[in-house]
């Protein structure tokens, strides 16, 4: 149930206490890159959780950009809070907390199949999801590792910047659970895709874009001189 990346250093990554739901590889498309038709990013995605709409979900994702491109250094989501640097297993990650999109979330059918069905019928999903993202770049910024932990947002919390009475410690407790959800170790041999793939066909690849990955930039020709 451990994903081993091809990045340098190679990392062995997994969720600690959640069942493996599936692992797959595919192509993400970054449409705001300026590349004709969008920039294709080789992507390895592993998902952990029960997928019952009420239990946590954990994501291990590895994206590799083509030669001539690099991941930008800004690794936060719009409207995110509590941005900072977290260390997991001796590896530093930029972290932030945010509420996932209800309509453009690649993982909604995996974490909440009922909510995805309701959304497909032009309804409103019954739950919102809170996420803590950890991200870092490797191999001269050509590889990006994203770890993300999610839980359903309690119904009484309508804003993560103005918590209701009695909920002052909720976000801090959630972020602690997120920090403890992942195991990260340095692996001896890089081997992207070493985990046997198990189908997670419900993953909505059309939303595996800048919303999840963040942005990229091309190297200027002067950078190569």
Label for each model-derived stretch:
Residues 27-170:
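Conserved polar/disulfide-associated segments of primarily extracytoplasmic proteins
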Residues 1-44, 156-225:
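N-terminal targeting sequences that direct proteins away from the cytosol to non-cytosolic compartments
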């Amino acid at each position: 149930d451990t994903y081993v990346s091809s990045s340098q250093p190679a990392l062995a990554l997994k969720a600690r206490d959640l069942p493996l739901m599936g692992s797959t590889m595919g192509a993400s498309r970054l449409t705001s890159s300026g590349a004709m038709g969008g920039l294709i990013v080789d992507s390895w995605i592993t998902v952990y959780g029960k997928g019952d709409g009420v239990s946590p979900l954990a994501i291990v994702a590895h994206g590799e950009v083509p030669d001539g491109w690099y991941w930008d250094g800004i690794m936060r989501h719009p409207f995110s809070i509590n941005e900072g640097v977290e260390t997991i297993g001796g590896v530093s990650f930029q972290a932030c907390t945010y509420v996932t999109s209800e309509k453009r979330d690649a993982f909604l059918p995996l974490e909440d199949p009922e909510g995805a069905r309701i959304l497909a019928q032009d309804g409103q999903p019954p739950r919102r999801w809170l996420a803590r993202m950890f991200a870092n770049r490797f191999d001269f910024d050509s590889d990006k590792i994203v770890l993300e932990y999610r839980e359903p947002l309690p119904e009484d919390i309508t804003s993560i910047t103005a918590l209701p009475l009695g909920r002052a410690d909720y976000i801090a407790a959630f972020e602690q659970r997120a920090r403890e959800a992942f195991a990260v170790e340095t692996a001896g041999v890089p081997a992207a895709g070493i985990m046997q793939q198990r189908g997670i066909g419900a993953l909505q690849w059309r939303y595996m874009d800048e919303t999840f990955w963040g942005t990229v930039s091309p190297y200027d020709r002067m950078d190569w001189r």
